[in-house]
Amino acid sequence: MAYKNSWLQAVREGRQRFAAGIDIGSQHVRLVVVSQRARGALHLEHMSTVPLAAGAMAGAEIVDRQAVARALRDAFAGLPRVCATHALRCAMAVPSSATLTTTVPLARLAAQSDCEAEDGGVALAGLAPAVMGEAERIAGLERHALAVDWYVDEMPSPVRSVKIAATARQHLEARIECAATAGISLSAIDGEPHAALRALRHAASRELDPNEPYAAVWVGTDGVYGWSVVDGSNVGEMRYPAPEHADLADALRDLLQGPEFDCALIGGEIDLLDGVGFSLADIGDVLGCSALPFECALLGSHARELDDALLHEPAGAVAFGLALRGVLE
């Protein structure tokens, strides 16, 4: 019996999940909507770039919440009907300049808590007070004013560690309020570099050979972030500007500690490189490999014709990475 186009085939393929990634930049709101079935291909459903009113943003801070809410409404106004009639998981990013991160040995936190370093699952909940103490220390704020995320890093290492990220609660509350004013319910808030890295890693899985060493670089309004990826694992990272680096080229050389790269994938607002006298080709020269700009257009089938410039702009990395999180979780 043929099940093509039948309800039984739809059940076998799994429910189609829809997710939106929202990137609030200094001058634009960028929206990417994707969908995917459990074992199916990724579909690009909708893209939109909406300019923000001048003065709406001041660094990481939302100054004019009404202007941001209007831009969000405009970005979602052209949402295809098929997206509007499905549950849409929406994620938004917090700029890295508003987020502080640290890595702490698990054993040290365990010694301050009532759980063993080798415990897992529920037992690790005992780490929470010690984690909050570390977050207060790096942020210089009391815990009631902080939003904190943390996890045990499972990457192979001689010492197990805990990754901690903290941001002022006001940054999250402002984004949640703007989204709610626009009629949008957020299911997740992520950091810009993490969302961009997720997008770049996905691009590598589609465009590069398996196990091919590569560099992932993201250019944001507050700096340049880079990662070296070998056998699917992040083995090195860099950030610029940073006190230890004289210039961007010096920072990029931090990634050259392992195997030679075959390729560097570059996302973000690449035009900002002009401000430090750099270019896409210069990144490739420093890393000793070809440099390819990130493009959403290459990463999924198009459910319908898409004409927004974001389809081919490296600046779409954060919004795409946020949307990708929604269909993968």
Explain the meaning of each model-derived region:
Residues 1-329:
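Hydrophobic/aromatic-enriched cytosolic interaction surfaces used to assemble or bind macromolecules
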